[in-house]
Amino acid sequence: MREGIFMSLEESEKRQEGYNKSLSSKIKKWINDSLTLGEMEARRLRHDPTELFTRAVQPVLWLLVFGETFTRIKAIPTGGVPYIAFMTPGILSQSVLFISIFYGLALIWDRDQGIIQKFLALPVPRSAFVVGRTMGAAVRGLSQTVIILLLALIIKVDIRWSIFSVLGTIFVVVLESAFFSCFSMILASLMRTRERFMGIGQVLTMPLFFASSAIYPISIMPKWLQVVAVINPLSYVVEILRSILITGVYENMLLHLGLLIVMILVAIIIATLLYPRLAS
């Protein structure tokens, strides 16, 4: 009887080992698939590097014109921080938002060219497609981050330069790119034409930007707009970046970071579920 029990235990252990190996191999395959797709997306940027500079024009104008002007006027309360320093994290977030939220346009283009259909025929998890796309968006977002921070250095914006601030900024920009590119993929899955997607994207970007703490504190907004700003993911991104780069006050940073990560996970799940609709 004992021998039978030992044999059952051994068989159970072998099955568990096989399951663990299978799970481990699946995870490794998923990571490799995601990285491969992310690399493919990054190559598109290498083939058209002028996109980096054309997209950098708007944030540069915001900092040089709007930022310098309102720093002199001193019309917006910033808690003793120079206005141009206050708005720099907001303009960085805006730039990443604008790049990421129109990322779904490339998906619609790929669908019209029949590329999405070919991808979906591959033995690759749908979530790997979504995560790979977010990696491509993150590369674009980080490239804009470099340009904006270099400009901030040139015009002598008072930024807290340190290893922590640089690594923290990279991490937050990747998170922002992930969320808004997933949001863009969700929109692309629901839109049938590029024109409709562009229209919806343009309608959403400006409210997301102005209904956040990017260029003014939430406290000076009307009450109804404060409610919108509190549930706006861009507000969390701006506040985290402002804590890291400008104020050094980390009181609510972990809360904002946690909420942002939860939003990203939900967005990835929804984008994964809707991704096959792109082929139809």
Model-derived features: where do they sit?
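Hydrophobic alpha-helical transmembrane segments of membrane proteins
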Residues: 78-102, 106, 175, 182
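Alpha-helical transmembrane segments and their short interhelical loops
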Residues: 126, 130-201, 206, 248-272
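Membrane-interfacial helix-loop-helix junctions in multi-pass membrane proteins
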Residues: 44, 75-78, 160, 209-266, ...
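Junction motif at the cytosolic side of a transmembrane helix
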Residues: 4-15, 19, 245-248, 257-280
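Short alpha-helical transmembrane interface motifs in multi-pass membrane proteins
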Residues: 20-24, 47-50, 85-86, 96-101, ...
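Aromatic- and glycine-rich beta-strand/loop motifs that create alpha-glucan
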Residues: 9, 17-58
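Transmembrane helix boundary and interhelical loop/hinge segments in multi-pass membrane proteins
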Residues: 45, 100-124, 134, 280
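Hydrophobic alpha-helical transmembrane segments of multi-pass membrane transport/permease proteins
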Residues: 47-73, 84-99, 143, 206-208, ...
